């Protein structure tokens, strides 16, 4: 029979692993590299149509021009 302590630690390790792998997690390693919820001055000249299309490559809600800078929705 499997020891209950082993099951608890396996469950805990799996939970931590899934928390780190989830893109929306606060523990995510690629939070700064995310398109969503960020301004992107590297995009260049901003038009709402082109900014929205560019943001849809990594965000489900698209984006808009915020003070002449492309901003992707959260």
From Swiss-Prot:
Top-level taxonomic group: Eukaryota
Organism whose genome encodes this protein: Arabidopsis thaliana
Example GO biological process: defense response to fungus
Leader peptide range in chain numbering: 1-19
GO cellular component: a single term: extracellular region
Coarse class of the protein's main subcellular location: secreted
Disulfide bonds: 36-74, 46-65, 51-70, 55-72
Phylogenetic classification of the source organism: Eukaryota, Viridiplantae, Streptophyta, Embryophyta, Tracheophyta
Entries under InterPro entries matching the protein: Defensin-like_20-28
The protein, known as: Putative defensin-like protein 27
């Amino acid at each position: 029979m499997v020891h209950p302590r082993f099951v608890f630690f396996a469950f805990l390790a799996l939970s931590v692993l899934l928390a780190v792998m989830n893109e929306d997690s606060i523990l995510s390693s690629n939070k700064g590299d995310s398109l969503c919820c960020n301004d992107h001055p590297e995009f260049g000249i901003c038009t709402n149509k082109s900014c929205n299309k560019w943001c849809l490559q990594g965000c489900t809600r698209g984006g808009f021009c915020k003070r002449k800078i492309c901003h992707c929705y959260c």
